[in-house]
Regions:
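Conserved Rossmann-fold NAD(P)-dependent oxidoreductase catalytic core, especially the SDR/UDP-sugar
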Residues: 1-39
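Conserved SDR Rossmann-fold cofactor-binding beta-strand/turn motif
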Residues: 16, 65-66, 70
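Conserved sequence/active-site signature of Rossmann-fold short-chain dehydrogenase/reductase
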Residues: 20, 69-71, 112, 139
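Active-site Tyr-X1-5-Lys
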Residues: 23, 35-65, 90-91
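Short-chain dehydrogenase/reductase
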Residues: 32, 37-45, 75-80, 105-106, ...
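Hydrophobic alpha-helix immediately C-terminal to the catalytic Tyr-X-X-X-Lys motif of short-chain
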Residues: 46, 50, 54, 85, ...
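C-terminal substrate-binding subdomain of Rossmann-fold SDR/epimerase-dehydratase oxidoreductases
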Residues: 93, 97-101, 105-224
Protein backbone atom coordinates (compact mmCIF):
# COMPACT_ATOMS: atom_id res chain seq x y z
CA UNK A 1 0.00 0.00 0.00
CA UNK A 2 3.03 2.30 -0.01
CA UNK A 3 2.32 3.57 -3.51
CA UNK A 4 -1.22 4.44 -2.46
CA UNK A 5 0.04 6.66 0.34
CA UNK A 6 2.15 8.53 -2.20
CA UNK A 7 -0.94 9.44 -4.19
CA UNK A 8 -0.13 7.30 -7.21
CA UNK A 9 -3.47 5.47 -7.10
CA UNK A 10 -6.89 7.08 -6.80
CA UNK A 11 -9.12 4.03 -6.53
CA UNK A 12 -8.58 0.50 -5.18
CA UNK A 13 -11.03 -2.42 -5.11
CA UNK A 14 -10.52 -4.70 -2.12
CA UNK A 15 -11.80 -8.28 -2.37
CA UNK A 16 -13.38 -9.10 0.97
CA UNK A 17 -15.97 -11.77 1.74
CA UNK A 18 -19.54 -12.14 2.97
CA UNK A 19 -18.18 -14.62 5.51
CA UNK A 20 -17.37 -11.60 7.70
CA UNK A 21 -21.02 -11.89 8.81
CA UNK A 22 -20.38 -15.39 10.16
CA UNK A 23 -23.78 -16.21 11.56
CA UNK A 24 -27.04 -14.31 11.37
CA UNK A 25 -30.70 -15.20 11.20
CA UNK A 26 -31.85 -12.12 9.31
CA UNK A 27 -31.09 -10.78 5.84
CA UNK A 28 -27.77 -8.98 6.36
CA UNK A 29 -26.92 -5.71 4.64
CA UNK A 30 -23.65 -3.78 4.70
CA UNK A 31 -24.55 -2.17 8.04
CA UNK A 32 -25.14 -5.48 9.84
CA UNK A 33 -22.84 -6.41 12.75
CA UNK A 34 -19.83 -8.49 11.75
CA UNK A 35 -19.50 -11.89 13.42
CA UNK A 36 -16.54 -13.78 11.96
CA UNK A 37 -16.15 -17.45 12.86
CA UNK A 38 -12.85 -18.13 11.05
CA UNK A 39 -9.36 -16.69 10.86
CA UNK A 40 -9.97 -16.01 7.18
CA UNK A 41 -12.96 -13.77 7.98
CA UNK A 42 -11.17 -12.01 10.85
CA UNK A 43 -8.20 -11.10 8.66
CA UNK A 44 -10.57 -9.80 5.98
CA UNK A 45 -12.22 -7.50 8.54
CA UNK A 46 -8.84 -6.21 9.70
CA UNK A 47 -7.84 -5.52 6.11
CA UNK A 48 -11.15 -3.75 5.42
CA UNK A 49 -10.55 -1.47 8.40
CA UNK A 50 -7.03 -0.62 7.27
CA UNK A 51 -7.90 0.18 3.68
CA UNK A 52 -11.11 2.08 4.50
CA UNK A 53 -9.17 4.09 7.08
CA UNK A 54 -6.89 5.31 4.30
CA UNK A 55 -9.74 6.93 2.38
CA UNK A 56 -9.47 10.69 1.94
CA UNK A 57 -9.96 13.40 -0.69
CA UNK A 58 -7.27 11.83 -2.87
CA UNK A 59 -7.78 8.09 -2.38
CA UNK A 60 -11.08 6.20 -2.53
CA UNK A 61 -11.21 2.50 -1.68
CA UNK A 62 -14.16 0.23 -2.47
CA UNK A 63 -14.66 -2.92 -0.41
CA UNK A 64 -16.40 -5.78 -2.19
CA UNK A 65 -17.75 -8.46 0.14
CA UNK A 66 -17.98 -11.36 -2.26
CA UNK A 67 -20.47 -14.20 -2.05
CA UNK A 68 -19.16 -17.76 -2.28
CA UNK A 69 -17.91 -18.12 -5.84
CA UNK A 70 -18.73 -20.96 -8.20
CA UNK A 71 -18.12 -21.97 -11.79
CA UNK A 72 -15.34 -23.00 -14.13
CA UNK A 73 -12.23 -20.82 -14.29
CA UNK A 74 -8.74 -21.26 -15.80
CA UNK A 75 -7.31 -21.79 -12.31
CA UNK A 76 -10.08 -24.06 -11.07
CA UNK A 77 -11.18 -24.23 -7.43
CA UNK A 78 -12.57 -27.47 -6.01
CA UNK A 79 -12.74 -26.19 -2.42
CA UNK A 80 -15.90 -24.09 -2.94
CA UNK A 81 -19.31 -25.59 -2.30
CA UNK A 82 -20.84 -25.71 -5.81
CA UNK A 83 -17.59 -26.77 -7.43
CA UNK A 84 -16.94 -29.40 -4.76
CA UNK A 85 -20.39 -30.93 -5.14
CA UNK A 86 -20.07 -30.93 -8.93
CA UNK A 87 -16.67 -32.63 -8.71
CA UNK A 88 -17.89 -35.23 -6.20
CA UNK A 89 -20.79 -36.02 -8.51
CA UNK A 90 -18.16 -37.02 -11.06
CA UNK A 91 -15.63 -38.79 -8.81
CA UNK A 92 -17.92 -40.40 -6.20
CA UNK A 93 -21.28 -40.44 -7.97
CA UNK A 94 -22.82 -38.90 -4.87
CA UNK A 95 -22.98 -35.57 -3.05
CA UNK A 96 -22.08 -35.37 0.65
CA UNK A 97 -23.90 -32.70 2.68
CA UNK A 98 -22.88 -31.76 6.22
CA UNK A 99 -25.84 -30.21 8.01
CA UNK A 100 -27.59 -28.62 5.07
CA UNK A 101 -29.67 -25.89 6.66
CA UNK A 102 -26.87 -23.31 6.60
CA UNK A 103 -27.46 -20.35 4.33
CA UNK A 104 -24.81 -19.29 1.87
CA UNK A 105 -24.87 -16.45 -0.74
CA UNK A 106 -23.53 -17.74 -4.06
CA UNK A 107 -22.00 -15.87 -7.00
CA UNK A 108 -20.77 -17.06 -10.39
CA UNK A 109 -17.13 -16.26 -11.07
CA UNK A 110 -17.93 -14.51 -14.37
CA UNK A 111 -20.54 -12.40 -12.60
CA UNK A 112 -17.93 -11.49 -9.99
CA UNK A 113 -15.62 -10.26 -12.75
CA UNK A 114 -18.51 -8.21 -14.16
CA UNK A 115 -18.92 -6.45 -10.81
CA UNK A 116 -15.23 -5.54 -10.70
CA UNK A 117 -15.48 -3.99 -14.16
CA UNK A 118 -18.66 -2.11 -13.24
CA UNK A 119 -16.98 -0.67 -10.15
CA UNK A 120 -13.95 0.46 -12.12
CA UNK A 121 -16.12 2.11 -14.77
CA UNK A 122 -18.58 3.71 -12.33
CA UNK A 123 -18.47 7.31 -11.16
CA UNK A 124 -15.96 7.36 -8.31
CA UNK A 125 -18.28 9.56 -6.27
CA UNK A 126 -20.81 6.71 -6.30
CA UNK A 127 -18.55 3.78 -5.39
CA UNK A 128 -15.58 5.36 -3.62
CA UNK A 129 -15.30 4.85 0.16
CA UNK A 130 -18.15 2.36 0.00
CA UNK A 131 -18.72 -1.25 1.04
CA UNK A 132 -20.82 -3.50 -1.19
CA UNK A 133 -22.09 -7.01 -0.68
CA UNK A 134 -21.54 -8.73 -4.03
CA UNK A 135 -24.08 -11.30 -5.15
CA UNK A 136 -27.81 -11.52 -5.72
CA UNK A 137 -30.74 -11.95 -3.35
CA UNK A 138 -32.13 -14.81 -5.44
CA UNK A 139 -28.89 -16.77 -5.08
CA UNK A 140 -29.03 -17.03 -1.30
CA UNK A 141 -29.33 -20.80 -0.85
CA UNK A 142 -29.35 -23.32 1.94
CA UNK A 143 -26.72 -26.02 1.37
CA UNK A 144 -29.46 -28.65 1.01
CA UNK A 145 -30.93 -26.63 -1.86
CA UNK A 146 -27.56 -26.40 -3.58
CA UNK A 147 -27.14 -30.17 -3.41
CA UNK A 148 -30.62 -30.74 -4.83
CA UNK A 149 -30.04 -28.30 -7.71
CA UNK A 150 -26.72 -29.90 -8.63
CA UNK A 151 -27.97 -33.46 -8.18
CA UNK A 152 -30.93 -32.82 -10.47
CA UNK A 153 -28.85 -30.91 -13.03
CA UNK A 154 -26.38 -33.79 -13.33
CA UNK A 155 -28.94 -36.52 -13.84
CA UNK A 156 -30.18 -37.48 -10.40
CA UNK A 157 -27.02 -37.78 -8.31
CA UNK A 158 -27.84 -39.25 -4.85
CA UNK A 159 -27.30 -37.07 -1.78
CA UNK A 160 -25.81 -38.35 1.49
CA UNK A 161 -26.44 -36.27 4.62
CA UNK A 162 -24.29 -36.10 7.75
CA UNK A 163 -25.14 -33.99 10.81
CA UNK A 164 -21.94 -34.79 12.72
CA UNK A 165 -19.68 -32.13 11.20
CA UNK A 166 -21.59 -28.88 10.91
CA UNK A 167 -20.18 -25.71 9.37
CA UNK A 168 -20.64 -22.80 11.79
CA UNK A 169 -21.01 -20.29 8.95
CA UNK A 170 -24.66 -19.48 8.29
CA UNK A 171 -25.57 -16.16 6.69
CA UNK A 172 -28.15 -14.81 4.26
CA UNK A 173 -27.16 -11.53 2.64
CA UNK A 174 -28.90 -8.54 1.05
CA UNK A 175 -27.47 -7.26 -2.22
CA UNK A 176 -29.95 -4.40 -2.70
CA UNK A 177 -27.24 -1.73 -2.46
CA UNK A 178 -25.20 -3.25 -5.29
CA UNK A 179 -28.21 -3.69 -7.55
CA UNK A 180 -29.47 -0.19 -6.83
CA UNK A 181 -26.12 1.51 -7.41
CA UNK A 182 -24.73 -0.51 -10.32
CA UNK A 183 -27.80 -2.27 -11.72
CA UNK A 184 -26.10 -5.64 -11.28
CA UNK A 185 -28.06 -8.81 -12.00
CA UNK A 186 -26.34 -12.20 -12.26
CA UNK A 187 -26.24 -14.18 -15.48
CA UNK A 188 -24.76 -17.41 -14.17
CA UNK A 189 -26.80 -20.11 -12.45
CA UNK A 190 -25.76 -23.00 -10.22
CA UNK A 191 -27.22 -25.69 -12.48
CA UNK A 192 -25.52 -24.36 -15.61
CA UNK A 193 -22.21 -24.07 -13.77
CA UNK A 194 -22.47 -27.65 -12.47
CA UNK A 195 -23.05 -28.97 -15.97
CA UNK A 196 -20.10 -26.98 -17.33
CA UNK A 197 -17.79 -28.29 -14.60
CA UNK A 198 -18.90 -31.87 -15.24
CA UNK A 199 -18.20 -31.44 -18.94
CA UNK A 200 -14.67 -30.19 -18.20
CA UNK A 201 -14.04 -33.15 -15.89
CA UNK A 202 -15.41 -35.67 -18.37
CA UNK A 203 -13.24 -34.25 -21.15
CA UNK A 204 -10.11 -34.72 -19.05
CA UNK A 205 -9.20 -31.05 -19.43
CA UNK A 206 -8.82 -30.63 -15.67
CA UNK A 207 -6.85 -33.81 -15.13
CA UNK A 208 -7.02 -35.26 -11.62
CA UNK A 209 -9.34 -33.04 -9.50
CA UNK A 210 -7.39 -34.07 -6.38
CA UNK A 211 -4.35 -32.05 -7.51
CA UNK A 212 -3.19 -29.51 -4.93
CA UNK A 213 -3.43 -26.63 -7.38
CA UNK A 214 -7.23 -26.79 -7.07
CA UNK A 215 -7.28 -26.26 -3.27
CA UNK A 216 -6.28 -23.02 -1.56
CA UNK A 217 -5.64 -24.60 1.84
CA UNK A 218 -2.47 -26.17 0.47
CA UNK A 219 -1.06 -22.68 -0.07
CA UNK A 220 -2.57 -20.74 2.82
CA UNK A 221 -3.38 -21.96 6.31
CA UNK A 222 -6.29 -19.49 6.60
CA UNK A 223 -9.67 -21.20 6.46
CA UNK A 224 -11.58 -20.58 3.18
Amino acid sequence: MASVSLGDILHVLYASTCSVYGMGGNLLNEEAPLNPVSLYARTKIESENIIMGMGDDYFSPTVLRMGTLYGYSPRMRFDLVVNTMSMKSFTDRKIQVFGGKQWRPLLGVQDAADVYVRCLEANLQDVGNQVFNVGSDNQNYQIDEVAEIIGNALGGIPISRDNSNLDARDYRVSFAKLEGMLGFKPRQTVDDAARAILEKLQSGELGNPAQRIYYNHYFDSAEE
